[in-house]
Amino acid sequence: DRPVTAAECYGNYPADMDSLMLYRLAMELMARGVNFFVPHGMWYDTEQVKIPPLISHDSKLLGPALHRYSDYVGRSVALLDGGRRVTDIALLYPIHSLEAWHGFMPGRPDTGKDVPPENNYNTLSDWLTGELRQDFTFVHPELLQGNLYSVHDGRLVLNTRQTRQEYRLLILPAGKVISTETLKRIKEFYDKGGRILATGQLPVQSAEFGRDTEITALIGQIFGIDPTRPMPAKETSAANKQGGRAIFVPAVTRETLRTAIARLVPSPDVRIPLLADMKAPADSLGGPLGVLRDHPLTPEMLGMFS
């Protein structure tokens, strides 16, 4: 629900990056919803460029391309302003699981790197956008509890003054802790025909004190799994008479994620072809948008984006 979404970009890229990299990152950011760019950095003293690259008319590499780049970005974000995202998938932001794991004590990892070992929401988001070409929206669990969201005919509906979005699938990233009130809303979504895909680790503890048994009961009612016991080694599924479906994938990969989404949302509102399915010369397609294939990051490094 952000009409303007800003992002600082290009900071700490190689000093000798070419002008085409300006466009590559711009396209990646726009595909992810950014419509306000803050290029880094425009140094007043070209002899004191502490963090490359220099993005200004003084740069011999980038300076000649900046006027066309500025026109391109200006036109593109003008088209994106005021638009409405159309996507079938909501991805729950696992803030309660991240917060429950973190501790302020000597010996713990640096701030931003202290994440639970099962943490996978950044991996899921990278696969969805960069490789599976499935658009999605992060949903904050506290907002999900309120009146911004409602459930109608198997859809989770976000309806505000700025936008309206209707989700048919809610993905739960791995995590042991969740708000009981959030899980109640998720159960309502399932009971009214919604589709749920859980990955890696089901919640077993409540973000609120003294309500763990409610979490256990709700997870059992949705997935038919007791989360206090070891997670099932194989994929499990559940369904109800209202059309609700829930799938738990214990060891999620790109392929198991793609397959599960196809089962739960067989006819998406928008379908973007996979690179492998596009009928074009291989050398014209380039690589996937995602960072994980070319730059494998540890869970700790991925946690820096939390």
Language-model features: locations:
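Carbohydrate-binding surfaces of carbohydrate-active enzymes
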Residues: 1-306
